[in-house]
Amino acid sequence: AWNKTPADLNDEDYTNFYRELYPMQFEESLFHIHLNVDYPFNLTGILFFPKLSPSMDMQKDKIQLYQNQVFVTDNVEGIVPDFLQMLKGVIDSPDIPLNVSRSGLQADGAVKKISGYITKKVADKLASLFKKDRADFEKKWNDIKVIIEYGMLSEDKFFDKAKKFALYPTVDGSYFTFDELVEKTKDAQTDKDGNHVLLYAANKDAQHSYIQNATAKGYEVLLLDSPIISHLMQKIEGGGEKLKFSRVDADHVDNLIKKDDTIISKLSEEETATLKPIIEAAVPKETYTVQLEAMDSATSPFMITVPEFMRRMKEMQASGGGGMMGMGNF
């Protein structure tokens, strides 16, 4: 099937080919990408986007490499970019050298061009699907976001292209591209120092009260829950703009997006000095630091927060231990 032109195949042909390749795979692929180029290198193939779990607990080695229709290997490391090794399918090229090391493959001129071509084709396909039927793309987002986010982290060219179709869902079920999100939130969510703050939650139920505090002020709260999102936020924040992500439970919302408004404490200094040691005696000193602040009357009297920087560093260390397909490189 991969040696035929796309014009000679219909959707049923691709479905049957996928079932033939993976007879034990009960779920159909989400969509496919047909590769067909003969200059400056020769490459044919069909790649399928499977439905993936957000956990990244999945197998690679699902893309089969052929040379002139003769099976060679299902290990395409060094040929196909890391983030695309989660796809399934077949590639066939006589221009890929065999019996060389991974470093040798990565240094080979033809392999570099093939890898770049595959990345571009995938990005173009995703952009086309987004433009053609955005509603359907949004429905599929949770099943494909890990691949896209991983690609944005590992491939700068893919990152630039993905800005047009990568989505940022909110806790109320809306989806925005990055540019749409920035435009919608820049006025309300810019603090007194000119920092544009994007608020997010990782768990709607566990962080419900914090989300309510933020949405009550008219702020958008994103729902970002993939295992590599901390890495991606770090990369976006490093883009040179005065923009940062803050999880809703990192502090009181008025501290996350500080405005010029000043809230006057209803407690005197003496009352504060009396109350603080009472609270400190009730919580483990090794775990919590007690801080008394003036807040608006709608706020809960007690809040437990974890500073954004500390929590994010822990999350990045946890996902960067080398157990997630090379994520230790980030």
For the regions a language model picked out, list residue spans one by one.
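Conserved GHKL (Bergerat-fold) ATPase module
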Residues: 1-330
